């Protein structure tokens, strides 16, 4: 390559990488995969090494991060939040080990390996044990003050167990299950979805309204101690132990290694285990454990010499998009789905991938017949990353979203501030079917044996069109359906009959009122106690309830201001469906004989129907004690969604574990 061509390519790569950095670090909206970014960066580093006369102090290869938006107050870090150098294979790790050993002149070295959490790096400042400020990494020198949003993350202690002044650093992230649920809600509401949990975490933390961040179920692992007053800690592993003792959440999967072979074994182990975690990791961080050796090795302008990040190979594959199918959800949102030639991604065969909405198809210029890059967002949901334009033949077909609903042929609309097309026909069969599936689901009426397949059979046979129709079903009708015998038909009729006794909150959630989730349904049920009282409530009365906002209050009032809905409630009454709250109020729990009396309970994960704070109050009102960690003295662990390391601790100490459903059964006895 001539010098002229090399110079031109270096300039192209710098412009490209600066754009990628801006999109990733400033806008929190990356346009390329990590694998593509890394390929461009490695090419730039190689060209600059071969052509040192073209080296520049502002090249992306030596610069840390990007600029800061003026939305939040700026914060200057007391010590720079440096990025880490990258390793992509075993050879890179051995080169790192060789450089470290040369730099410490024969001293013994021990490494500490940690999972590289794929989230948003933040710093936390404490004065005399109190959390006073939190900031994003920003460009490594200057970040943004996001204190109020970080206070909504329960994994971040507002007061430490000691009155110590320090700065801790960590990674805020969104659990995979929370990511899936958030995107499902955004799709139902016709909003843009997040591409992956990292974007979801970053987008949530950088919201100007802390209430939005509070609803996003974020968490955080602290991975380092930047400084601490009046205390010297000789090793990184001991600093993590100290942070854990102070009340921080540290990742339990770290390991100290005496040799580079042990480091490589750890990397290989977690490359296999990675899909089983409930949070995203994109590699392994390897650090020299001894702090004195770290100081001896020092740093470059961009990264410390005593640490490196091993990047896992990108879980991306190429396949052909053969078609686009449309589905209509229970709220009327029309979602396009890519049909793919079967391909293995992250251990499973993928045949379909979400395209989310029409805007995404246009932005990525996706056409039927294209070869596309596919990955699993959050290692869970298959998504189309981009089109391989070089493989186009000219025979690909442009796709246009229909103007009418594929299920009922009603005209589709795009509501104000929504990106999704929506069918607003209340009699749309697809919406009715999806609504029925939701009505019988686990957190709603929980009718055993009545899943999507059976609902579809009943719907296609014209046996059900409304929720109330379920309670008019007969055994004779069920026996007309495929796979139903005398016993299965009898069991299902009994399960439907049993569901009539459910408490009000299950019925409310099952109705599918827009913006009302399981937790809000329970709040309404406990507050009003009967359906009749809730139906009469005004918007002002609803907004006066803690955690109920204007949008939800309006939605509830609008829902019940409908003659068809009132007719449905009357039918429920005639069929004997309970419409009163059967749960126990905190005020009624005093002096009640309870399983929880005298027991120590740990709550972990997200409780769908009842928030953890409410669950804690009720357990304590029943004479129990709620603690934050599992030990030999723990009697019970209640595990909700995205339960983490406390489950492993429960198994280690042989502690009984309940899911939320079992917990609610005991609570409501």
Curated annotation (Swiss-Prot):
Parts of the chain that traverse the membrane: none
Which reactions is this enzyme annotated as catalysing? NAD(+) + (deoxyribonucleotide)n-3'-hydroxyl + 5'-phospho-(deoxyribonucleotide)m = (deoxyribonucleotide)n+m + AMP + beta-nicotinamide D-nucleotide
- List GO terms (cellular component aspect): cytosol
Q: Tell me which residues bind NAD(+).
A: 34-38, 83-84, 114, 137, 171, 287, 311
Q: Which residues form the BRCT domain?
A: 591-669
Q: List the disulfide bonds.
A: none
* Enzyme class per UniProt: ligase
The GO biological-process annotations, alphabetized, read as: DNA repair; DNA replication
The UniProt annotation places Zn(2+) binding at 405, 408, 423, 428
Q: Work out whether the entry's keyword set contains Metal-binding.
A: yes
Question: What family name appears in the similarity comment?
Answer: Belongs to the NAD-dependent DNA ligase family. LigA subfamily.
Give the PANTHER family listed for this entry: CHROMOSOME TRANSMISSION FIDELITY FACTOR 18, DNA LIGASE
Name used for this protein in its record: DNA ligase
Species name: Bacillus cereus (strain ATCC 14579 / DSM 31 / CCUG 7414 / JCM 2152 / NBRC 15305 / NCIMB 9373 / NCTC 2599 / NRRL B-3711)
What are the top taxonomic ranks of the organism? Bacteria, Bacillati, Bacillota, Bacilli, Bacillales
Q: In the UniProt record, what gene is named as encoding this protein? A: ligA
């Amino acid at each position: 390559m001539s010098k002229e061509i090399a110079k031109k390519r270096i300039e192209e790569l710098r412009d490209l990488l600066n754009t990628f950095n801006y999109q990733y670090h400033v806008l929190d909206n990356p346009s390329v995969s990590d694998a593509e970014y890394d390929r461009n960066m490695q090419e730039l580093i190689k060209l600059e090494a071969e052509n040192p006369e073209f080296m520049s102090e502002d090249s992306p290869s030596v610069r840390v991060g990007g600029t800061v938006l003026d939305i939040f107050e700026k914060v200057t870090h007391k010590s720079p939040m440096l990025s880490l150098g990258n390793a992509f294979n075993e050879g890179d790790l051995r080169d790192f080990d060789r450089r470290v050993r040369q730099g410490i002149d024969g001293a013994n070295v021990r490494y500490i390996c940690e999972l590289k959490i794929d989230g948003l790096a933040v710093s936390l400042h404490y004065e005399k044990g109190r959390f006073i400020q939190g900031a994003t990494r920003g460009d490594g020198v200057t970040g943004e003050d996001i204190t109020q949003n970080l206070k909504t993350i329960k994994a971040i202690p507002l007061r430490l167990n000691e009155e110590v002044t320090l700065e801790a650093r960590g990674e805020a992230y969104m659990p995979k299950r929370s990511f899936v649920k958030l995107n499902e809600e955004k799709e139902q509401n016709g909003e843009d979805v997040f591409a992956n949990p990292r974007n979801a975490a970053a987008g949530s933390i950088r919201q100007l309204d802390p209430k939005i961040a509070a609803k996003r179920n974020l968490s955080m692992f602290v991975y380092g101690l930047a400084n601490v007053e009046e205390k010297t800690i000789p090793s990184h592993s001991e600093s993590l132990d100290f942070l854990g003792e102070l009340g921080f959440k540290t990742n339990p999967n770290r390991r100290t290694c005496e040799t580079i072979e042990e480091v490589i074994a750890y990397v290989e182990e977690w490359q296999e285990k990675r899909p089983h975690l409930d949070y995203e990791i994109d590699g392994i961080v390897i650090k020299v454990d001894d702090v004195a050796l770290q100081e001896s090795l020092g740093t470059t302008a961009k990264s410390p010499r005593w640490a490196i990040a091993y990047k896992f190979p990108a879980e991306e594959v190429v396949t052909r998009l053969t078609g686009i199918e449309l589905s209509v959800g229970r709220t009327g949102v029309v979602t396009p789905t890519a049909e793919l030639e079967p391909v293995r991604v992250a251990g499973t065969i993928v045949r379909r991938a979400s395209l989310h909405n029409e805007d995404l198809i246009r932005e990525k210029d996706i056409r039927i017949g294209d070869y596309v890059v596919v990955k699993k967002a959050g290692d869970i949901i298959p998504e189309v990353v981009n089109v391989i334009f070089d493989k186009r033949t000219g025979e690909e077909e442009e796709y246009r979203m229909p103007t009418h609903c594929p299920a009922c042929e009603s005209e589709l609309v795009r509501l104000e501030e929504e990106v999704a097309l929506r069918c607003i026909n209340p009699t749309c069969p697809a919406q009715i079917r999806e609504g029925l599936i939701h009505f019988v689901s686990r957190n709603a009426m929980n009718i055993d044996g009545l899943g999507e397949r059976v609902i579809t059979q009943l719907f296609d046979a014209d046996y059900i069109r409304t929720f109330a129709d379920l309670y008019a079903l007969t055994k004779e009708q069920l026996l007309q359906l495929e796979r139903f015998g005398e016993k299965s038909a009898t069991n299902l009729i009994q399960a439907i009959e049993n569901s009539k006794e459910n408490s009000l909150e299950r019925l409310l959630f099952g109705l599918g009122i827009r913006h009302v989730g399981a937790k809000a349904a329970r709040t309404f049920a406990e507050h009003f106690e009967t359906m009749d009282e809730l139906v009469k409530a005004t918007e002002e009365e609803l907004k006066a309830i803690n955690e109920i906002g204007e949008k939800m209050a309006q939605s509830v009032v609008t829902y019940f201001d409908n003659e068809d809905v009132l007719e449905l409630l009357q039918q429920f009454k005639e069929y004997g469906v309970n419409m009163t709250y059967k749960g126990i109020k905190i005020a009624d729990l005093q002096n009640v004989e309870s399983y929880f009396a005298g027991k120590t309970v740990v709550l972990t994960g997200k409780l769908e129907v009842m928030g953890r704070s409410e669950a804690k109050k009720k357990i304590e009102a029943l004479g129990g004690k709620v603690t934050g960690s599992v030990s030999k003295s723990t009697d019970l662990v209640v595990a909700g969604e995205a339960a983490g390391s406390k489950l492993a601790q429960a198994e280690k100490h042989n502690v009984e574990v309940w899911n939320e459903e079992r917990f609610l059964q005991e609570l409501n006895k």
